């Protein structure tokens, strides 16, 4: 299934290569490779495969999950769709505090609730782990994370391990 998703990402032009003018990721890293997983939302056949695979990963690796939390902004639609497939509630974490009472978590999250974070892409895992920290600070039990794509960077793997978070 992963090979089918990888091929699908290439087919829809989500994975871009440019060795002459590298992409600058949100982390500041310059890379000749960029994956725009938002494009899966406009490719229904691939979107269905991606969301079903994410749902399968949640069921297999995090069977005790009670709620899915998407990362802003690209993880939000995937969390919503996977939540629909699994009949689970979903919410998301804002990247910055909202003006109204500084609220960062949208949706109802109860202390002690078992959470799976839904992310579109992981490089250094910095933004993903910021979401994990917000959730833990709110009393959630973060079981782990699922993502569409990871660059498999050592820094990201090390950051996830240091935070005690598994990504599948």
Kindly give the residue locations of the regions a language model identified:
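Active-site-facing substrate-recognition patch
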Residues: 1-61
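Conserved PRPP/pyrophosphate-binding segment of the phosphoribosyltransferase/PRPP-pathway fold
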Residues: 45-106
């Amino acid at each position: 299934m992963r090979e089918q998703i990888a091929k699908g990402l290439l087919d829809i032009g989500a994975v871009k290569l440019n060795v002459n003018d590298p992409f600058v990721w949100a982390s500041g890293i310059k890379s000749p490779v960029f994956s725009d997983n938002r494009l899966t939302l406009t490719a229904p056949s691939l979107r269905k495969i991606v969301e079903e695979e994410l749902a399968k990963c949640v069921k297999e690796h995090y069977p005790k999950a009670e709620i899915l939390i998407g990362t802003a902004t690209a993880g939000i639609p995937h969390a919503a769709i996977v939540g629909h497939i699994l009949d689970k509630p979903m919410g998301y974490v804002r990247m910055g505090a909202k003006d109204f009472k500084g609220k960062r978590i949208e949706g109802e999250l109860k202390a002690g609730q078992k959470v799976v974070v839904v992310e579109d892409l992981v490089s250094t895992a910095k933004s993903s782990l910021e979401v994990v920290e917000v959730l833990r600070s709110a009393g959630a039990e973060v079981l782990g994370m699922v993502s569409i794509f990871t660059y498999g960077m050592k820094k990201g793997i090390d950051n996830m391990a240091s935070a005690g978070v598994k990504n599948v």
